[in-house]
Structure formats: structure tokens, C-alpha cells
Amino acid sequence: MATKGKRNIYVGPADHGHAGKPLNVEGKALGVVRPGALVAEAATGIDENAVAATIFGASRLWADKDQQRTKTVDDDWAINENMVAIRARSGEFLNVLVADAQTITKSGTPLSSNADGTLKIAVTPATVGVTSEEILAYSDEIITTSGVTLVRVVVA
């Protein structure tokens, strides 16, 4: 992931309205959690989000990298570690994990949950005969992913 030049998960707000500070959430990692993964809170901790894109109301919570121990976006959180996630606000920019084989041809492409901690190109109501999906973010770069890749997005 870092070979693509991405070193951070939180990139910042669009308007500097929050002084460049993310909203952090701490909790115990319930499994191995990858930085940039879409995660969900449970009573006992935080785990990668396995909720389908057609289930609306998902929290916009992404695993941060372990900055306290100077780790990188390539270093996963281990089971039972006290981890940090970012509760993203609309308009903030993050580098998040996008699933393999996603061809993002324009900036602003809507992205939804892939039910494994990654995002994928969303199915929108304009697609006839399919169920729409909750849009969590919009791409802020053009890329074709080969493997799970960090992609810069703006939170919906």
C-alpha cells in the first residue's frame, strides 16, 4: 500500500473548519484490522465492517494507522490491541481501502461497503433493476485497483 505514496489515513478537512483534527475513537481490536479499513464499533471493541452496502445507516468509521508507536499504513492492528479509528465527518478526506479490481474512471465516483472492510464502486439508483446501496464516500482520484489499495476519498 505505501508503495503508492500514501503514508497517512487522515488527509484532512476540505475547509479547515475542524483545525485539521480527526475525531478519534479508541477500542480493542476484535480481530486483525487493516489501517484504512471500514470498521464498526461493538460493545466489546472495534472490528472490520462486514455489513452489506444495501443495509443503510453504517457508521463512517475507519481504522487509523498506529501513530503512537510510529507504525505505517502497512502495519495491521493485532487482535486485542487498543486501536484508534477515525469517525469521519462529511467533507473530510481519507485514504481508505478499496477492493481489488475496481476501475474508478473519474473523481467523484460513489463508493459503498464491500462487506469486508473495503469499499467498492456503488450501485446507484440509476442502475435499472438493482437495489441501491448506501454511499459512504466519493473517490478523489482516478485509479484501477490491483489488490486491495488505499484510495483518497471524500466522505459523503
Question: Language-model segments: which ranges?
Answer:
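Surface-exposed, low-hydrophobicity beta-strand/loop segments enriched in small/polar/acidic residues
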Residues: 1-156
